């Protein structure tokens, strides 16, 4: 396993290939979009990378961000689907914990049971869920007629703020009770 502050062009390509293979297999990217952008176009100077290679191929990757002095270090990792269950994820996460200590945030993307099992095996606790929702714009139906007594207007700060915050808090409580997301040790 290599711990690097910067990836070479070849390593960068191999990591992106791993992410593409995993995305194709799982149906969802294994890491966040901002990390993909860091990989493609250069990231923060404080980013570091852990690589596990076999047969000239990256089979495990961890992106480590230690810049958040309040919430603590954050890691996202990906293991080639062909090597899941072979200890690659466990080795990566063990090494990250050696580097960062136990105050660590781990992001898990999607519903891959193996990722959630790995987090649980290290006693991470799920603390947040992020949902991405979308709707095709090609099948939008016309809006129903609106009762003339109903007034539709823009948000008015100072007038609508309390009601909006109350509704927003109610929705966030519902969202937080759902699956998949971020874990903490």
Regions found by a protein language model. Name each.
Residues 35, 56-66, 135-139, 159-167:
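Short, surface-exposed, charge-dense and proline/glycine-enriched linear segments
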Residues 6-12, 19-105, 109-110:
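Conserved donor-binding loop and adjoining core beta-sheet/short helix segment
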Residues 66-70, 81-150, 156:
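Acyl-donor-binding surface of acyltransferase catalytic domains
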Residues 4, 50-53, 83, 118, ...:
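Broad hydrophobic/π-residue packing in well-ordered secondary structure
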Residues 131-134, 180-184:
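Short, surface-exposed recognition loops or helix-turn segments adjacent to catalytic cores
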Residues 1-35, 145-182:
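Short amphipathic alpha-helix that is part of the acyltransferase structural core
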Residues 37, 119, 181-185:
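Hydrophobic transmembrane signal anchors and adjacent membrane-proximal interface regions, especially
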Residues 38-43, 101, 140-144, 166-168:
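Low-complexity, flexible helical/coil segments
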């Amino acid at each position: 396993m290599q711990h690097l502050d910067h990836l070479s062009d070849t390593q960068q390509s191999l990591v992106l290939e791993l992410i593409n293979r995993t995305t194709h297999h799982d149906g969802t990217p294994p890491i966040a979009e901002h990390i993909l952008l860091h990989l493609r176009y250069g990231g923060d100077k404080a980013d570091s990378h852990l690589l596990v290679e076999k047969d000239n191929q990256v089979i495990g990757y961890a992106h480590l961000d230690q810049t958040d002095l309040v919430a603590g270090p954050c890691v996202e990792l990906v293991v080639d689907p062909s090597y899941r269950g072979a200890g690659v994820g466990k080795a990566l996460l063990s090494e990250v914990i050696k580097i960062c200590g136990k105050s660590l945030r781990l992001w898990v993307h999607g519903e891959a049971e193996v990722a959630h099992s790995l987090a649980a095996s290290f006693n991470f606790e799920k603390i947040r869920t992020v949902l991405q929702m979308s709707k095709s714009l090609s099948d939008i139906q016309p809006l129903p007629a609106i009762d003339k007594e109903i007034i539709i207007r823009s948000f008015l700060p100072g007038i609508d703020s309390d009601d909006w915050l109350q509704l927003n808090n109610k929705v966030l409580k519902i969202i937080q009770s759902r699956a998949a997301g971020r874990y903490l040790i």
